[in-house]
Regions:
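Short helix-perturbing small/polar motifs within transmembrane alpha-helices
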Residues: 13-14, 21, 86-128, 165
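Interfacial aromatic-anchored transmembrane helix boundaries in multi-pass membrane proteins
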Residues: 25-37, 68-96
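Hydrophobic alpha-helical transmembrane segments
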Residues: 9-14, 42, 46, 58-66, ...
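Hydrophobic transmembrane alpha-helices
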Residues: 1-55, 59
Length: 188
């Protein structure tokens, strides 16, 4: 038996495609207008949170990040900075697993705080990698160096975390829950 079911793989690829396509189409426009990385983080961490909530298995965030990276490179082969988000998705995966999915998604207040913190940490890691390896020194200087760039990504991670958590809570309030939870509740 495989680790991910067919439905889980479909969910992972849908959220990865959402991230990959929106990042290749909208994020460059936002970045050119404002020179801020917030939209990349918002799209990425919202997609990851939704996928992890739906599947609740280690490897989900990593899979979403790697598939989104492949999609990104298919449309924008020179956008090497996206490798920072690949690393961030791995960090997110590890931190979400060690925090416990039950704690993240069944304890609303604690889960919201933890998911936001995980998004902030993961986004900051992406910012450090992108700043250290892929940004020009002139662009970095404007934002206070690598740490300043990591801070901007952390702000984007905060926004993405809040949006992702809000969407999860909105879906739950409308009765939309992952298949595993429906089986436990006898709704499937």
């Amino acid at each position: 038996m495989s680790y991910f079911t067919a439905r889980e793989i479909a969910s992972i690829t849908i959220f990865a495609a959402l991230w990959g396509i929106l990042s290749t189409t909208l994020s460059p426009i936002f970045y050119k207008l404002f020179h801020l990385p917030f939209l990349c983080d918002l799209i990425g961490f919202t997609s990851i949170i939704l996928a992890v909530w739906w599947v609740e298995k280690i490897g989900t965030a990593t899979s979403v990040g790697l598939i989104a990276t492949i999609i990104n490179f298919m449309f924008r082969p020179t956008a090497m900075h996206f490798l920072g988000f690949s690393a961030a998705s791995i960090i997110f995966d590890i931190l979400a697993f060690t925090s416990g999915y039950k704690r993240l998604f069944e304890q609303k207040i604690l889960g919201s705080i933890l998911l936001t913190a995980i998004s902030i940490i993961s986004a900051a890691v992406a910012g450090v990698i992108i700043g250290a390896l892929f940004m020009s020194p002139m662009a970095l200087q404007r934002w206070g160096g690598v740490l300043g760039w990591a801070g901007l990504h952390a702000i984007g991670g905060t926004i993405g975390g809040v949006v992702g958590i809000s969407l999860v809570n909105a879906l739950i309030s409308r009765g939309i829950t992952p298949p595993k939870k429906r089986k436990k509740e006898g709704k499937d």
